[in-house]
Amino acid sequence: MSQEPRIKLVVTGDDFGYCPHRDKGIVDCFHAKAITNVSLIINGSSAASAASLAQRYNIPIGLHANLSEGFPVCTELKQNSSLINGQGVFHGKMGIRKMLSQGLLDMSEVRKELCAQIKLFCELTGINPQHMDSHQHVHVLPGIREVFAQVLEEHRIHFTRIPVELGLHRCTWLPDTLMEFYKGVEEDALNAIEVFRSHRIRWPELYIGLSTMGKNMSTYNIQEAIRYGVCSWQSTIATLPDITNSVSIELMTHPGYPSIPEDGGCGEGPDDFSQSLDRLHELEVLKSTSLQSFFLGNGVQLCTFRDL
């Protein structure tokens, strides 16, 4: 990749605050310079201690808005709200999408919950979120994306995530059901672009993380995702004047030491994703000398959102 433009890579550790084991792994990755940034899940069981860790170690931190797992933060919405089911918890990754498709979500309640999560984030960290994305990509869903963009602009949060991974169609190792979900996420994300732009929200030019999650994370897969993304980006901007010869990328990651039963989660205990050894696998790949050598030898500069 010697002929490629300079690459600025934000490596985000998602789900910070989900449980102490995950948090320790994320902090270890930060100390190893394997991630540059974390995204705090504010209704996670260890959100307060995670925020303290970020302050102690000066870890750049944003908000991982959560409307799909666990309990709401907004007190007003804990008892009777379109955002929760009969057990008082959010509807889940697919459940919120079903509720939305049926027109059953009250967007004024979405606004209240997002604002409550930002308020709690500021109370715990002492700062405004440096960026704001979401758990399970709900921020790009129709209806929610408009409210999300308005809330970010009002709170002067300038960066978000657009989960569109160039080259995803080439990833034949992904199961059909997962690929179908990812394609839906990408379609929603593409439709969110103009909404976010209209509210002066920014994001890195490229995104990686769908094809490299869990057991699918490897130095090779990350290399190939970067190579394909950069080549596609170069082709797109080749005919445009006054484009700088650098490109920014966000790599979404979920490293950590696996959760143990009954310890962690967002009020319902840790899910299978968090208890999986895939979390440890991601940690080991991110810290590997092979990946770090690839970055060093190919003009990849690790950075934070503030560096963009």
UniProtKB/Swiss-Prot annotation:
Transmembrane segments: none annotated. GO terms for biological process: carbohydrate metabolic process. Its cofactor is Mg(2+). The active site is at D14 (proton acceptor). It comes from the Eukaryota. GO terms for molecular function: hydrolase activity; magnesium ion binding. Its EC number is 3.5.1.-. InterPro entries: Glyco_hydro/deAcase_b/a-brl, YdjC-like. SUPFAM superfamilies: Glycoside hydrolase/deacetylase. Belongs to the YdjC deacetylase family. PANTHER family: CARBOHYDRATE DEACETYLASE, YDJC DEACETYLASE FAMILY MEMBER. Probably catalyzes the deacetylation of acetylated carbohydrates an important step in the degradation of oligosaccharides. This is Carbohydrate deacetylase. The lineage of its organism: Eukaryota, Metazoa, Chordata, Craniata, Vertebrata.
